[in-house]
Amino acid sequence: MKWCAAIISTILLSLVGCAHVAPPLIEYTLADTAIKAAKAVQAVRYAPGKWHEAEEAYRQARILYNEREYEQAIDLFNKARIAAEKAENSARLTRMRNGEVL
């Protein structure tokens, strides 16, 4: 009977270990799109601070994603998206103030 209890507890522990967060595909895609949009308006030139913040958060998020650390990756993908959107908006505003056509 003890071996039966040991098998059941082993099975339960392995099932608990299988519980995980699904890959954050939406957050990944939104961050990637925001990075590309910021790059398209030359945010690296016109909003370098926010661009660097976005790029660094995105780089770290992809590393965590590849390591299947999805909960941490979600936070960084969201941080990257927000920073990239701010960089894009700042770059657009600066370029418009300078009279550039976008």
Predicted segments, located by residue:
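Long, charged/polar, soluble alpha-helical segments
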Residues: 16-102
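Sec-dependent bacterial lipoprotein signal peptides
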Residues: 1-18
